[in-house]
């Protein structure tokens, strides 16, 4: 038997029971369930564990390079008859709280190094997922980024037509 769900399943409680027979492969690839605590329309993003995008900056005598190049979509918990406009912007005021919660000591990444493309997304009427994706990368003279603890850039989602998820409303780069 094969079952696939594309999109979202709306349920107050979700129970997943999987039974295997001895003649069937016992491989289960991946199941991720994210709980969004809100009964009101809420926007959120899902990008791996704890909405964290990682990458590295490599310093060489000839200059510095970065492998940071990621993208993510925005989602809504409730479809709207008029759709949603979701904005994504860096919010370095969240770095201290992140460091405290995760026992880290990242420095805030200055906006001059952050390249956000397509930072305003549209979730169409009746849809749950944005039509496009935000693309994020690093730009500029990266040789000045030398903090050995690393850097953090919180990318906060916001929408005038919906709330923002407390747990999944920020993507951390």
Walk through the language-model features, giving the residues of each.
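Intrinsically disordered, low-complexity Pro/Gly/Ser/Thr-rich segments with frequent PxxP/GP/PP motifs
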Residues: 116-143
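Beta-sandwich strand segments
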Residues: 144-147, 160-173
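A short beta-turn/strand-edge loop motif at beta-sheet boundaries
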Residues: 76-85, 96
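Beta-sheet-dominated interaction scaffolds and their linkers
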Residues: 39-76
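Aromatic, loop-rich ligand-recognition surfaces of beta-strand-rich domains
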Residues: 1-38
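Short beta-strand and strand-turn-strand segments in soluble, beta-rich domains
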Residues: 96-121
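Short glycine/proline/serine/threonine-rich loop/turn segments at secondary-structure transition edges
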Residues: 140-152
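Beta-strand-rich extracellular modules
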Residues: 17-21, 137-139, 156-160
């Amino acid at each position: 038997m094969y079952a696939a769900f594309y999109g979202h399943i709306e349920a107050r409680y979700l129970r997943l029971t999987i039974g295997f027979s001895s003649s069937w492969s016992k491989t289960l690839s991946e199941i991720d369930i994210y709980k969004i605590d809100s009964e009101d329309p809420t926007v959120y993003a899902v990008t791996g564990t704890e909405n964290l995008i990682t990458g590295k900056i490599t310093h060489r005598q000839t200059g510095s390079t970065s492998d940071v190049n990621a993208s993510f979509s925005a989602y809504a918990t409730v479809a709207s008859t008029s759709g949603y406009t979701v904005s994504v912007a860096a919010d370095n005021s969240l770095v201290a709280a992140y460091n405290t919660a995760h026992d880290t000591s990242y420095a805030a990444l200055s906006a001059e190094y952050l390249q956000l493309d397509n930072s305003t997304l549209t979730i169409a009427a009746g849809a749950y997922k944005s039509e496009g994706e935000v693309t994020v990368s690093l730009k500029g003279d990266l040789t000045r980024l030398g903090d050995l603890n690393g850097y953090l850039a919180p990318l906060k989602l916001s929408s005038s037509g919906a709330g923002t998820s407390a747990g999944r409303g920020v993507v951390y780069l």
